[in-house]
């Protein structure tokens, strides 16, 4: 693809980055390359590809033209050097840590996270010998105090799911920098339209592309984006990137590929061995979804804040956690990191606790009761009985998912219709 003007705005890049006309046919909509493999020119060409000496495509578990277009688009929008698209957001988190971790090593993790991530890091990673150290999300000093010689990464969400907690990315990035480890930020809830964590010091950014990026609840996927700024050769903590790789005749990724080292490793080894590749069809759906991302997110944010203000005044509601409300303890951080809006996913507490929460779900009509977020449709969930069900009560409360909590993902419908549906459901609680 020809080089885009560096001064193009976000909306322009969302449409054009990574999406050149098809060179074979001239088709303007980027094609779906639904293939497993690619014909080599000759034996030397095949050898150069397998030796990582030439760019190109080998097998769609590693690389695919449609997937590569999505990687370029997402890396551009996040201000990164390269990207690796995966089969899901959970896979992206694992791929982000895979080159960094080893048995016995630690990752410091914010305690306010998506429930699936807490399970993944707190339980499943133990089978790899990786140890997750959970700390208070709202206290950067807690991250500093948790650093040890075994620390290999710090992981946070820019805007925590489900509670809408805005993380102090800049302060935590300083802790990671002092410790000599990468800061990994999950930017799913904010999207690069609202927040670009790399501007605040993040080294790696992950997304569940399933959510706002694809935008219509029809394509599962994830991505890891590398800033290209972390200096892997400065210490011995990351031998996967800084020492010779026997699989590739002693090639050292950091020396050979420089600021693309992490991305090249992710394709050549992580995807090769873990196999968590995204299908070309899902990549194509997401490519098309991103073209309207700015328009959708503006409406999501506008509707979300309108609904939050309505709920804040409702007699059946105990509290509302939305960083766009002036009453929110995260209001100032929201203005700093997400000046154009703090998203449309937030929580509120219904009076009556667990049972009222379940009744609320059964009383809505416009809302869909699903586990997804970031859809054009308005969605509702009771985290304590679903996404955070496997956690202990203490973990649920720490993550902002107590028994009374309802999570909303506000869609792009008419705000007055969304409010009317919530109003009739709240009235049914008595």
Where are the predicted features?
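Conserved PLP-enzyme active-site core in the AAT-like
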Residues: 2-5, 14-16, 20-23, 83-314
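PLP-dependent enzyme catalytic core of the Aspartate aminotransferase-like
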Residues: 2, 81, 104, 122-123, ...
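Glycine-rich beta-alpha junction loops
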Residues: 19-21, 34-40, 211, 228-229, ...
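Short amphipathic alpha-helical segments
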Residues: 55, 81, 220, 282, ...
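Conserved N-terminal alpha-helix of the aminotransferase class I/II PLP-enzyme fold
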Residues: 42-94, 116-123
